[in-house]
Amino acid sequence: VKAGPAHGSVSDTVVVGPRTTGEEYSGRDGALSVPTPVVEDAGIRIDGRADEEAWSTAAVLTSFTQYEPVEGQPAAQPTEVMVLVDQSAIYFAIRAFDDVPDGIRATLGERDSFTRSDDYVRVVLDTFNDQRRAYVFSVNPMGVQHDGIWNEGGSAGRRGGFGPPVDDNPDFLWESDAQIADWGYLVEIKVPFKSLRFPEVEAQDWGIQVTRRVQRNGFESAWAPMTENIPNRLTQSGRLTGLLDLDPGMFLEINPVLTGNRFGALDENDRFVHGSADGDFGLNMTYGVTSNLTLDATYNPDFSQVEADAGQISVNERFALFFPEKRPFFLEGTEVFGMPRQLVYTRSIANPIGGAKLTGKVGSLNVGYIGAGDESFDAGDPDTYVNLFRVKKDVGQSGSLGAVYPDRTVAADHYNRVLGGDARLVLGRRYTVTLMGAGSFSEDPDLGAAESGRMLYSRIERAGRTFSF
């Protein structure tokens, strides 16, 4: 199970919760630093009602500002966000008021599928407060979930590349529910600390942003005002302060897989003759080494339940086809291995015997390692062994420097190795420069002499609402 309840309901008498006595923080007035209310045990049931007494002590985020289609105007529809934490999780209750409740768009559908069709609210948590990477949790008025990782430094396909490229492949463990009423809708969210990575320090601050989209008119608003004149949206977020002694608890997930099969065939007398039974065993494990480092391991993984690839035409193609990664083992921590131009293609590990992966962040250094054995489909061919190292260091407010080293070895004289580096620099408040270089070294005696190649890449972007590139 990857998520809690994701079922909304329609009600004219939905409880909107007790009136909070907590402080209000107006985004439009610049009250963007929020001391986080802490309760011993919230005892909150995620049912889309927010009627527990614990909500009365929550901090309230108010006064959203529109950023689409008109920037800087007060939000046309009011939104209030209540937030608090207890020993094990962070909670949100979001009241999305709407003066045309019949115009609320909401469908009960698949996870991660509604952001282009439904109204929704979105919580963005920058747990390392580094303004580079954040968790995204979105919920529509029916309680359906969308989650992913927000990565600064790439193009999202909007004007001038403004906006985060949200990777919605990762699925996290969290709960949501919602209720639609005659005044709008209410969303409740619970995110356990064990589902998040964050620094191992006694006291910490998190970046926070809450946004809302009204689908019928395309209006988008945010608690912390945002402008396209600044290239990094996470630098425009608010702060949750005073988070003390957060304990993610022990995170250990073990998923054994056992499959069996038995074949039979008709003999010459048209009798069905069964063969001997056969079986296979596999194991997947995820372990939280610390609150900011995760170890994944797999043995003989079974990917039969993974979503099938969309069909592609392979006739008269000069280049190899590209397929997105959907296998769970390779999805954890994918943001660590991302680069301006893709050098890491884990789908080339087609039939893994086993593997291990370590991803996370230590101080200002992002680290990632993948090691795997790839079994040959042909009995006469040797197996392949893959090692991948990646480091990326935060530089300045939004910049970074990184290096990557993928190595694929079949035998001592059969290999492909790549060494690459990348940099992202933010100049002033509007310009972003991205640089990347890599060298490839291959040897295969069956095809002749060793080969090598190089690539260089650069990009400059200007953020702006009226002029961008």
What do the predicted segments below correspond to?
Residues 410:
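Long, charged, mostly alpha-helical binding arms that flank functional sites
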Residues 276-284, 351-355, 382-390, 398-406, ...:
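Transmembrane beta-barrel architecture of outer membranes
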Residues 1-394, 399-402, 413:
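Structural preference for beta-rich elements and adjacent junctions enriched in aromatics
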Residues 361-363, 428, 463:
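Short strand-coil-strand connectors
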Residues 211-215, 459-465:
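C-terminal, active-site-flanking charged/polar segments
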